[in-house]
Structure formats: structure tokens, C-alpha cells
Amino acid sequence: MSNIFRGLGVALITPFKSDMSIDFEALERLVNYQLDNGADFLCILATTGETPCLTRSEKDEITRVVKGVVKGRVPLLKYCGGNNTRAVIEEMKSSDWEGIDGILSICPFYNKPSQEGLYQHFKAIAEASPLPLVLYNVPGRTGVNMKAATTCRIAKDFPNIVGIKEASGSLEQVDEIIKNKSEGFEVISGDDALTFPMIASGAVGVISVIGNALPRQFSRMIRLEFEGNYGEARKIHHQFTELYKLLFVDGNPAGVKALLNDMGMIENVLRLPLVPTEVTTKQKMADILKALHVE
């Protein structure tokens, strides 16, 4: 299998109304905004989508709405993961995957498995998966880092595992994976702030948070890198340096929801235990948007 998840992938937020119900009209607007402004693929129901705070029926409806808007124009990556291997497999078996192009699956969290445990977890999932898999390594959330050697071992043994969303924060680890990975397996940045150096090192794209609000600018940076124009790409990267930090000061997706609210696209609502970003943070981000001439 080959990886089709390249370029700018956007980890879609889930917009809510003030009564905490899902704002499906805003979701449709947001998806069209991505498609009109350079997104190469979309990732639904992952961390940025506040998935732990959604019911199964809400997840199904979000999937239906997004598929209905996209209509095959870009690939769709859908999250299905957890820290109970058997439960993840059961969810895979009971879900409708029509119109979905791949599955994003996270390293088990809280349990803190060994490297062998991580291998066996993804072995079981790969053998059960109906679609190509993209692994997700984010030790800041899971409590365990999947080492480069483990990632490369998994990729070698299971050809339906086509990539990894790598968010360890370690460029050394990224380089080690890219250097030793099997053919057809690719690295995707899981960190907006490290996307520029990761693509320069051989990553093929990003699953982005900032892309929700600024897909045109962020996709341009990525395309410039693909073309070898690192000087112009670096200028865009440096424009975002402060914004990268502010987006996560009060937790994700609080920052990007504040940006989208300032742009008039959504209400600034999150479900507990997440809360909106602080007023001072929101104002700083609004000032950056103004300087970038984003309305």
C-alpha cells in the first residue's frame, strides 16, 4: 500500500453552539473553507475534534456530514484508537468506513505499555483494519513514546500501515525514522511548529491544528518546501512562530477555536473539561491575525 495523506492535512475541530450541541452548519462552512483554501486531506474525530467528549451517534453524524461535503474531493482520514486493543478492533468492525480513505490510530494512553506492547497492539489492529493505517505517536498525551526502532519494525512487518503522525517533538527521532523506514512508509508532522524542519528532513506533510484557521497560508508554506523554495517557506514559518505558541497556551483546540471565532466562523464554545482560551491570549492572537491581514 502507498500513503495518500500528503501535504496539508487539517485536524478538524468540532464546532459547538452555546447550548453545547454540535453546530453542523458551521462544520459544513469549515469543511468548504478548507477545500477552497488548499487543504490536501482532512482528518476527522481526532484530538482537535474533542472526540473524547462526543457520543458515538455524534461521531457518526459528523462523519456523515463531512463525507457529504467533501464528496471525494480530498482523502479523508478518520480516527479510531484507544488504550483497549480489543475495544479498538470492535469499533473498527462495527463502524461504516464507506467514503473514508484511512484510519488514524494513537499509541495506547495511560496504560504506558512497553515497546513490545506497542508493537503487539498495532499488530492486532493492522491485522483487523479494513483500511490503510496511520499511526499516531504523541507522548505528551499518551505518557509513552514509541521509539523509532519500534515504528520502523511495525512499518516493515505490516504494509497496510502507511505512515505515522509523529508528534514526539524530537527531530532526532524523526530523522531516525526517515533514515531507517521501509519503502512506502512515510512520516507526517503532528506538530505545526515543527512542520517546516520536518518536511526539510523528509516528512511528507502535516496533520495540522493551525490549518483550521489558516489553510491557505500554511499549505503555501508546505508547497514551497516541496518545490525546494525553502527561503520563501521559511518566511511564512517565521510569521507563525508566536502563533504556534499561543495556540496551545490554554490547551488544544481552545486556541484555534478562538482564532476561528475572531474570523466569524464559529462560536467560541468547548465542552468540559476544556474551556475557552484566556481573553489576553485571544487578543494576542487576534493582533497577529490582523498583522497577517487575515479577517
Segments the model singles out, each with a brief description of its role:
Residues 27, 59, 63, 88, ...:
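A general structural signal for well-ordered alpha-helical segments in protein cores
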Residues 2-143, 153:
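Active-site beta->alpha loop and helix N-cap motifs at the rims of alpha/beta catalytic domains
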Residues 24, 28-31, 148, 282-289:
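Short, amphipathic alpha-helical "lid/cap" segments that border enzyme active or binding sites
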Residues 7-15, 37-39, 203, 207-295:
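C-terminal alpha-helical cap/extension of soluble enzyme domains
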Residues 137-138, 160-161, 271-272:
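Glycine-rich phosphate-binding "P-loop"
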Residues 127-128, 141-248:
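Catalytic alpha/beta core domains of metabolic enzymes, predominantly
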Residues 54-57, 90, 115-118, 146-148, ...:
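Short secondary-structure transition/capping segments
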